[in-house]
């Protein structure tokens, strides 16, 4: 919690940014302890990548993109001991916060691939059901953004210093 000072951004690792993250940073609201995309949906798939079970539950995927107001007094509850002793549901559902302290971000900042239809304005795409790197999953998933995932992976692996196949 950065010694309970300033702001922080958390994002899951199964995402790609399609816009400048500074634009997300500009959405900070000092009156909120956290800001998230407040998804309200039922999943289209009961199974995720590699056969993982996928269930519906309250505030699903809210904690996958978070603007944390680390200095907000309500976040002083989030200590290492709290995180160690709380259930995953308690942490991911922000149970230490009153509802009015959880601010809303535009859905485009945590666009759920497959769960939502294609959106050319999505600023951050979340491959919450599985990334296209899982070949079996990618072949049957119907991902709207698989090509973008693979393009970004190639850019990540690319080196102008070497003309070697990866």
List where the protein language model places each region:
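GT-A fold catalytic core of metal-dependent nucleotide-sugar glycosyltransferases
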Residues: 1-44
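A generic fold-level signal
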Residues: 3, 58-60, 119
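Short, flexible coil/linker segments at or flanking structured domains
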Residues: 12, 54-56, 93, 113
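Conserved catalytic core of nucleotide-sugar-dependent glycosyltransferases
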Residues: 27-91
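A glycosyltransferase accessory/donor-loop signature
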Residues: 65-166
């Amino acid at each position: 919690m950065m010694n309970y000072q300033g702001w922080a951004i958390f994002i899951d690792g199964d995402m790609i940014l399609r816009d400048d993250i500074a634009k997300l940073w500009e959405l900070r609201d000092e009156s909120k302890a956290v800001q998230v995309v407040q998804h309200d949906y039922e999943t289209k798939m009961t199974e995720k990548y590699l056969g993982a079970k996928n269930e519906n539950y309250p505030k699903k995927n809210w904690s996958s993109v978070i603007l944390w107001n680390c200095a907000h007094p309500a976040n002083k509850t989030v200590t290492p001991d709290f995180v160690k002793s709380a259930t995953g549901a308690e942490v991911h559902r922000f149970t230490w916060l009153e509802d009015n302290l959880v601010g809303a971000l535009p859905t485009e900042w945590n666009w759920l691939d497959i769960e939502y239809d294609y959106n050319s304005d999505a600023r951050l795409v979340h491959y919450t059901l599985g990334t296209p790197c899982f070949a079996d999953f990618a072949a049957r998933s119907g991902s709207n953004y698989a090509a973008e995932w693979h393009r970004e992976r190639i850019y990540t692996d690319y080196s102008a210093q070497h003309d070697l196949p990866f």
